[in-house]
Amino acid sequence: MVALHERGTAEAKKDKPRPSAAKSPSPSATRRPLERIQSGTPQLTQAMPPRLLYGLPAVGNTVALTIDDGVSSDVVAAYLDFIQRTGVRVTFFPNGVYPSWTQHAPTLRPLVDSGQVQLGNHTWSHPDLVTLSDSAVVDQLSRNEKFLWNTFGVTARPFFRPPYGSRDARVDQLAADQGYWVSTMWNGTFGDSDLLTPAQVLANAKQWLIAHHVVIGHANYPTVTHVFNELADLIRSRRLVTVTLNDVFNTT
């Protein structure tokens, strides 16, 4: 198995352009109605998060689904429907530059208010932070923080995810100075930062959707929406408990 930091870096460094809308099949209804697989807030003993977070504590059968970007309004809508129907708990890392988050705020905000969905900071427009000046890094984080507060009434602190997983000690410190002291990486992936087939997304999910993993996905290409039934089946058959980062970690 690929080491945690290597897995994050391998996917992160594939390409640098900001995610953009793709010409690919539109999201469609899943083959059968999605069924609820989880209800309520998991009762967990919370731990302090590390400053560099890759996975979850080895307690229980928890898994964290973390979904980035939001290029496609249709995919964001499909994810929200998946969350509402199944009861899964998800942490989104939005880029506020994408209109999808404003468009779907009426649906998303109640899920945020209930705690079923958490929001983290993924910067305003998805640049490689390592290449930016100090002031530009701060602007990317603060602008997105302001957007999340004004739109959803919550702060994303202390969790931020650097675009492409590209970070260094300088970026980490600048983020921490803004209250973002947990650089949130991952140790599992759907691999869908690129356009994959449904079979490829599902194969990645089968490999990485396991206990104690922080799994990264993207609300960009619609491919993942065609395997929502299979993802729900995996969670159910493996007796996984989906969690937000706030469910697991005490940051107060």
Model segments located where?
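N-terminal twin-arginine translocation
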Residues: 1-17, 22
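Active-site beta->alpha N-cap acidic-glycine motif
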Residues: 29-128, 136, 140, 147, ...
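C-terminal domain-boundary segment and adjacent tail
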Residues: 48, 52-58, 100, 223-252
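Structural recognition of the beta-strand scaffold that forms the well-ordered cores
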Residues: 63-66, 90-94, 118-121, 158-162, ...
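Extracytoplasmic/secreted cell-surface and envelope-processing proteins
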Residues: 74-75, 101-102, 127-131, 167-171, ...
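A short acidic, amphipathic alpha-helical/loop segment
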Residues: 78-82, 106-108, 170-174, 227-231
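CE4/NodB-like, metal-dependent polysaccharide N-deacetylase domain
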Residues: 84-91, 118, 134-168, 202-217, ...
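His/Asp/Glu-enriched short active-site or ligand-binding loop at hydrolase and phosphoryl-transfer sites
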Residues: 166-208, 240-251
